[in-house]
Amino acid sequence: MSIVSLTGIEVLNNPAKFTDPYEFQITFECLEPLKEDLEWKLTYVGSSDSLDHDQELDSILVGPVPVGINSFLFKADAPSPELIPASELVSVTVIILSCSYNDKEFVRVGYYVNNEYDTEELRENPPAKVAIDHVVRNILAEKPRVTRFNIVWDNEEGADEYPPEQPEDEEEEEEEEEEGEEEEEDEDEEDDDDDEDLNGDAVVDLEKEEISTPRDNDEDIEIDIASESEVEEGGVEEEAKVNTPKD
């Protein structure tokens, strides 16, 4: 559970010139006392193609933070135009307002920013070189994108970093259960081997050939009995032909 919850952000000084500072009235709730300060940071995304053009406009430490509802005014300077690609100065970009505790970010709010010229003439016929003094920004304050992250707070040190250790007794019981299961499997395999030795070729025949129906078994028994009776009585060694009821 997050100890600090962001409850509201009011975007001030909007719309404004590109070179004007950013202003935010930030409100958050703290559920428990914090040992460290909160770090708030505003980042301007200078290019959609590379992070190298991102600019950290300002950062501020807020603390000590009392329990309850807290509010403060966060101001940040405008980005440096010379650090932004000329093709992306007059376009749509993003600013990111984030908060961290103990160098761990737990909330991030992103806003789209539309940069355009302040006159219709410049919008229709933009100059070859960007006239930054005539560029205005408009933050889409009504459509923020909020992302939250789980972190370890003061009262949760080590709670999420390492899994709980199992007692040694439980580990020994699990090992004994595994050994018992292995012994039972070995015994089952030995029993299967004994069955094959006792049945001889019959087991092999069942694996290689189709299983006979009860009627076929009866016929085989009759053949064996007839053959044995003929050998005992007449001493005839020729194979006896036994016709089935269909024959």
From Swiss-Prot:
Compartments where located: Nucleus
Acidic residues bias spans: 154-199, 217-237
Signal sequence, renumbered to the chain: none
Domain of life, per lineage: Eukaryota
Summary of subunit composition and partner proteins: Interacts with histone H3 and histone H4.
Entry similarity comment: Belongs to the ASF1 family.
Record's protein name: Histone chaperone ASF1
